[in-house]
Structures are given as C-alpha cells and as structure tokens.
Design a protein with these regions (language model features):
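Conserved SAM/SAH cofactor-binding pocket of Class I
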Residues: 4-63, 192-279
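Conserved SAM-binding loop
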Residues: 49, 109, 235, 314, ...
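Conserved proline-anchored active-site loop of SAM-dependent methyltransferases
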Residues: 77-88, 212-216, 274-287
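A short glycine-rich, Lys/Arg-flanked "PGG" loop and its adjoining helix->strand segment in the class I
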Residues: 91-103, 296-308
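Conserved beta-strand signature within the Rossmann-like core of class I S-adenosyl-L-methionine
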Residues: 104-113, 309-316
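Class I S-adenosyl-L-methionine
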Residues: 129-166, 317-350
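SAM-dependent Rossmann-like transferase core, predominantly class I methyltransferases
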Residues: 135-208
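Mobile active-site "lid"/loop adjacent to the S-adenosyl-L-methionine
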Residues: 240, 276-303
C-alpha cells in the first residue's frame, strides 16, 4: 500500500501500525474523514465518521464505512481529525473533537506540511496540552495525552464558536450583508468572480433557475432580488456547512419563490428542465481528489440540466480552457466580459 492517494490519511493511521497507540475497543469518531486505501488496509472496529462535503461523504459510504449518528451526547475514547487548511475552521474542529471525547480519551490529527501542519499542531497543543508527534509522508501527526476534560474550557468554547454562522457586512450583498462561516468558499466576502457574473447578467430572467455550486448563496440572492419573474430556484452545493448558510440568506425570498436546497455532488449531474443556470464552478476539489476536471464536469451537468434553449451564465478564471467543453454541450457560446483575471460566458443549451 502506498501513501500517494492521501498522504495525510496514511500518516494519521501510522501510530497504530507502529504500536505507538492502541485502537480502542469502543471504536472512534473521525472528523473531516476521507476514504482511502489506508482505511481499507485493516479493520478499524467501531469507526464512524462525519464529513460535510458530499463527494467525500459519498466515497466513505461507498467504501462501507459507517456515518456517525446524530446523538450529541455520545462520547468517544478516540477522535481522529484531518483538519482543513482554513485555520478558524480547523480550530473549531479541534474544539469539537475535544467535546466529543470520553474521560481519558485522546485526539489524534494529521496534516500535510504544505497545508499548515505546524500551525495545526501548535493550535491543538494550545487547546489540549503537550502532544505526541511523528513525521511521515511529508505530514505531521500529533496526538494528545489522555484527557479527563478540556485543559482550557474557556478557549475550547471560544474555538467551538468559530464554526457558528455569523453575519458579514458587505454593501454588495443583498440587504447589505450575508450569513457565512469560516471554511466556506469566499466565506467573508463577495467573491470577485461572482460579482463580475452578476454585473453581466441579462435584463430579464424568468421561470425555473438553478445555481450549481451555490456556496453561501450570493448568486441566488442576486438573481432573486433582480428578477421577479423567476418562479423557482434550486441551489446545489457540496458543502453542507455552506448550504446551511444559504438557507438563512434566502429566507427573504421564501414566500415568493419555490426554493430547493440540495446537498449534492454536481459533478454527478443534476435533474433537468431548467430555463437558466448560473454557475461559478470550482476548478479544484477537496483533499487528495483535487482535479481541474471538476469545472468541466459542472459544465456538462449544466448542459444536461437545461431545457433546449435554456441559458447558462458562467464565470471562470480566464486561463481555464472551458471553450471545448462548452462547444460540445451548447450552441451559441459567447464571452460577455473579461476583467480581473476572469471571464463571463453565456451559452444556449441544445
């Protein structure tokens, strides 16, 4: 077994292979979990996971790993963590890990050196005290001593609150602000590419629309604020944490428009029949499955989701070669604007 598919996952489990830690008979909770060959190499009795990103959650389910239930009071002798790169989100996840520990339990984490491993290690040490450590696969692995309780409950509570959705003031957003949280794409600002797309939307849109990769809902709020003849709008988003924010941001429109919120992997396709689709597609994925092909998959999903004659409105990094994919799935592909390193395109579904 090699570590090329997910070095951090392989590194995370190394202490059990090396005899540095024992796997608890009562099982473990895995926060930020990802599937990979390291999890298939041997049994991990009682392992359950939580993962808010849909394609990563789907991969864990396909591999046969059990999702954690919703029981908030369950406590674990071991909590595994693959912290995200965004520091506030990672701190919140560490605080959640400590809160989920049974008395005498440990937190074990790993992160790539190139993705903030030293900062993550320092943060867990600040929260939980001295750590055991090792280096493997260009990653840092670090774990707490057995903990009777969080050593610094005040800091743990402060960091746990970092994950709470909060109001962000921004005059470009509908109503002068929006609800978001750390770790969501462009969590504390209106993304420049999305703002460029909004500036070049047409004078009229109507009927059923969708946003593929909706994030916290900026494009959706702008569309619904501008176009009273839109009757239904669906938001498709892979990150459940972002989708929860979008639900709050779309509340002002809920009585006028039929809204749908879908925790969904757009790359696998979406239902059809839309009159228009707006999209600021990701050009990379999460974790070891990151790939430039993801944006192209979004364009193919949009082509299949639109009724014949339906229109796509797209913004993307200027250098990304999406023209061939657009030409394959659409007619009348046009570039509406180029600015700030981005391009806005529109295309008509065949």
């Amino acid at each position: 077994v090699t570590a090329t598919d997910d070095p951090a996952l392989h590194a995370l489990l190394r202490p059990f292979h090396d005899g540095l830690l024992d796997w608890p008979a009562e099982g473990a909770l895995f926060l930020g979990a990802r599937a990979g060959t390291a999890l298939q190499a041997r049994p991990w009795p009682g392992l359950v996971w939580r993962q808010p990103v849909k394609p990563l959650a789907d991969a864990l389910q396909r591999a046969g790993h059990a999702a954690a239930g919703d029981e908030a009071t369950r406590r674990w002798p071991l909590v595994l963590v693959l912290p995200p790169r965004q520091r506030e989100q990672a701190r919140a996840l560490f605080a959640q890990a400590l809160a989920a520990l049974a008395p005498g339990g440990r937190v074990l984490a790993a992160a790539p050196n190139a993705a903030g491993a030293k900062s993550a290690e320092a943060d867990l040490a600040r929260l939980a005290g001295p750590l055991g450590t090792l280096s493997k696969h260009h990653c840092r692995v670090f774990w707490t001593a057995p903990l009777a309780a969080p050593p610094d409950p005040r800091l743990a509570a402060e960091w746990a609150a970092l994950d709470a959705p909060r109001r962000i003031a921004d005059p470009r957003a509908h109503g002068g602000g929006f609800v978001s949280r750390p770790g969501v794409f462009a969590w504390d600002r209106v993304d420049a590419a999305s703002a460029l797309l909004v500036a070049h939307l047409p004078a009229e849109l109507a009927g059923r629309g969708a946003d593929l990769g909706a994030g916290w809902g900026y494009l959706a709020t702008q569309v619904l604020a501008r176009y009273p003849r839109v009757t239904a709008f669906d938001l498709y988003e892979a990150d459940a944490r972002a989708l929860a924010c979008a639900r709050e941001n779309l509340v002002p429109f809920a009585t006028r428009v039929t809204l749908g919120f879908h925790w969904h992997d757009v790359a696998g396709g979406v239902p059809g029949g839309y009159d228009f689709v707006v999209c600021n597609p990701p050009f990379h994925g999460e974790g070891p499955d990151a790939r430039p092909e993801l944006g192209r998959a979004f364009l193919r999903a949009a082509a299949a989701a639109l009724r014949p004659g339906g229109r796509l409105f797209l913004v993307a990094n200027r250098q990304l070669p999406y023209e061939r994919t657009l030409a394959e799935g659409f007619a009348d592909v046009r570039t509406l604007a180029q600015a700030g390193g981005y391009k806005v395109c529109t295309a008509v579904a065949r």
